[in-house]
């Protein structure tokens, strides 16, 4: 009986003192977003709309809007909803799912990880991006409408635009640059938010915040600055971290007063594959919400949003805080389009063109008309030709979702493709793949001839290939390393097969990392590890049955709180032999190969074992070599 709860601070002391159940009898509502009249919620295999008809903060009805989202691996299901400036929202979906959703515009299918975009105004679902990501639980938009994401199961953070070229079912977009600063890789990440609050120091505005819930238990803060077509990041600091081993920060958002709210799932068990669904240690009562303030700076005085007039809501769009503008745009969509559009036009006419924030205000006005499903043509053209490339790039995004409303769409895209700034050109290139007409290739060609960089070259080539019906040749993501010469032909074949198993999603590289160096303090390295190149029986046992609890390796302590997955039920004896042969002859290790017969013998000898190994018990059976 999962619920959506409303917490209120009625006396302004910074602590919740009122709880309202908006909706109950739900099952795993792992994504939701507000819309006029209610809330969209993930209820796999459905996307449902919970309507509050009388404004009493309680859902009165439930409508299944779409169905067919895969649910057989629930923690990969549609989640972490994030609204774009129009009010359409992105939905994250993990790698192990195969969704087939019937929509008014035809079926939408997704596989192998990616993002959907649902537009409530049009009841339209789109598979916006398809690429090699494992399990995304974080998505965020910056003040200019550019979107960013985290991979969760891996340590990667990406700018989303380069991944949004239209593709065929099951065909992934080429990988793009990882924005995670060197030395700051953590996993599993969850929740993503840009700092946009006058309550926080000026120098950190625009920084990005991401939470992590295993190993490093806290929140990373990185600066994000423009860098050519794309961006570059730098580690700012850890905004907070905890020594409570059950602390699990999973989401965060800025409040109307500029403070930051953080959701702590707070659970001793975090592995879905390692623990029984009904394990009594699963914690259903200790979830928390924290509020973070900056004591030496005043809180932001909240502006009126709920119940405000159209004119007041438009004035709110001048506020510096992203979340204030987000909530004001959402409130504007509650009003009739026949009243909002004339008010927007009047508001734009009243703006001071000499105001440094004029370009952004112009863009906000365009976004309001987009959200009303009535894009203002004059506003769009003003933004497409604005002197600020951020505005021009954002305007191309608006055009990309409104092709059919402008007879000169192709000409507008061509002009954007010839823009002086690479970000505008990349927006035009990605948009052209969705234009889906032969003439769209002209747009990509113009952009390529104008110039590409590390952010756009591969993506532009892929866009051209797809528009010509070609299958782009991708570089091997995890190239085969040199095979040790001392192995026999049979062992070399085993090493090669083991390399592929090592990099399977949810297998070895997920925790121990691609380079075998692990992630302190949760995931130990395989690099030069006595547990890998030492006694083969010990290694086979922990691979078959998993490992839990603290232990020490090469002078470092690992908490072992999240158990190593027991692979005995996931891999057969040959597969285990292959991947262990690979690990024992890679990452600085050099040891004998493992045969399937060795695995079979150990499996038979330990078939009565239940639960995980603990290192102290394993070492009693197989002491470390001296």
Give residue ranges: language-model regions:
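Beta-propeller domains with acidic blade repeats across secreted/periplasmic ectodomains
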Residues: 1-313, 331-333
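Short cysteine/histidine-rich zinc-coordinating motifs and their immediately flanking basic loops
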Residues: 130, 519-525
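Extracellular/periplasmic ectodomains of large secreted or surface enzymes and adhesion receptors
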Residues: 180, 184, 236-250, 254-501, ...
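Detector for the c-type heme attachment site
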Residues: 294-295, 511-519, 544, 548, ...
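Extracytoplasmic/secreted proteins, especially bacterial periplasmic and envelope-associated proteins
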Residues: 312, 327, 339, 394, ...
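Flexible coil segments in periplasmic/lumen-exposed cytochrome c-class electron-transfer proteins
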Residues: 472-493, 553-554, 558-626
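Sequence/structural segment immediately N-terminal to covalent heme-attachment motifs in c-type
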Residues: 491-519, 532-545
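Electron-transfer interface patches adjacent to heme c in soluble/periplasmic c-type cytochromes
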Residues: 506, 525-541, 545, 549-553, ...
């Amino acid at each position: 009986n999962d619920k959506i709860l409303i917490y209120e601070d009625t006396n302004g002391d910074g602590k919740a003192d009122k709880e309202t159940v908006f909706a109950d009898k739900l099952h795993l509502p792992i994504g939701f977003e507000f819309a006029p009249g209610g809330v969209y919620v993930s209820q796999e295999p459905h996307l449902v709309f919970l309507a509050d008809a009388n404004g009493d903060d309680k859902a009165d009805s439930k409508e299944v809007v779409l169905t067919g989202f895969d649910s057989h691996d629930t923690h990969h299901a549609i989640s972490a909803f994030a609204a774009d400036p129009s009010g359409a929202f992105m939905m994250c979906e993990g790698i192990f799912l195969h969704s087939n959703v019937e929509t008014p515009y035809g079926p939408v299918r997704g596989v192998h990880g990616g993002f959907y975009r649902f537009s409530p105004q049009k009841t339209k679902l789109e598979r916006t991006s398809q690429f090699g990501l494992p399990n995304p639980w974080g998505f965020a938009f910056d003040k200019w409408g550019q979107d960013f994401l985290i991979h969760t199961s891996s340590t990667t953070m990406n700018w989303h635009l380069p991944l949004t070229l239209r593709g065929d079912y099951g065909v992934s977009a080429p990988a793009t640059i990882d924005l995670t600063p060197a030395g700051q890789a953590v996993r599993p990440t969850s929740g993503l938010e840009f700092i946009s609050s006058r309550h926080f120091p000026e120098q950190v505005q625009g920084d990005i915040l991401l939470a992590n819930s295993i190993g490093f238990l806290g929140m990373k803060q990185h600066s994000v600055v423009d860098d050519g077509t794309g961006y570059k990041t730098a580690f700012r600091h850890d905004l907070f971290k905890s020594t409570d081993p059950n602390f699990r920060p999973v989401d965060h958002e800025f409040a109307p007063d500029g403070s930051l709210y953080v959701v702590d799932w707070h659970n001793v068990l975090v592995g879905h594959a390692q623990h029984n669904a009904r394990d009594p240690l699963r914690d259903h009562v200790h979830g928390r919400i924290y509020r973070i303030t900056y004591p030496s700076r005043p809180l932001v005085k909240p502006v009126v949003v709920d119940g405000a007039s159209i004119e007041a809501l438009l004035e709110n769009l001048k506020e510096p805080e992203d979340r204030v503008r987000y909530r004001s745009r959402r409130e504007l969509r509650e009003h009739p389009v026949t009243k909002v559009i004339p008010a927007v036009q009047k508001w734009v006419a009243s703006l001071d063109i000499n105001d440094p924030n004029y370009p952004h205000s112009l863009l906000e006005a365009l976004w309001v008309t987009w959200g009303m499903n009535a894009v203002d043509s004059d506003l769009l053209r003003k933004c497409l030709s604005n002197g600020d490339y951020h505005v021009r790039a954002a305007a191309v995004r608006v055009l990309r979702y409104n092709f059919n409303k402008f007879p000169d769409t192709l000409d507008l895209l061509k002009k954007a493709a010839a823009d002086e700034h690479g970000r505008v050109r990349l927006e035009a290139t990605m948009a052209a793949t969705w234009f889906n007409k032969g003439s769209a290739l002209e747009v990509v060609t113009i952009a390529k001839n104008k110039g590409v960089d590390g952010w756009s070259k591969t993506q532009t080539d892929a866009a051209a290939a797809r528009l010509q019906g070609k299958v782009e040749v991708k570089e091997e993501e995890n190239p085969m390393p040199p095979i040790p010469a001392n192995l026999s032909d049979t062992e070399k074949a085993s090493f090669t097969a083991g390399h592929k198993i090592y990099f399977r999603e949810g297998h070895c590289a997920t925790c121990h990392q691609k380079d075998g160096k692990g992630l302190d303090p949760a995931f130990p390295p395989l690099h030069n590890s006595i547990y890998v190149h030492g006694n083969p029986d010990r290694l086979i046992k922990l691979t078959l049955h998993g490992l839990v609890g603290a232990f020490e390796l090469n002078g470092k302590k690992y908490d072992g709180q999240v158990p190593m997955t027991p692979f005995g039920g996931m891999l057969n004896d040959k597969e285990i032999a292959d991947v262990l042969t690979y690990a024992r002859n890679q990452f600085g290790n050099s040891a004998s190969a493992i045969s399937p017969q060795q695995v079979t013998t150990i499996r038979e000898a330990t078939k009565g074992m239940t639960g995980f190994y603990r290192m102290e018990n394993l070492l009693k059976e197989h002491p470390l070599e001296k």
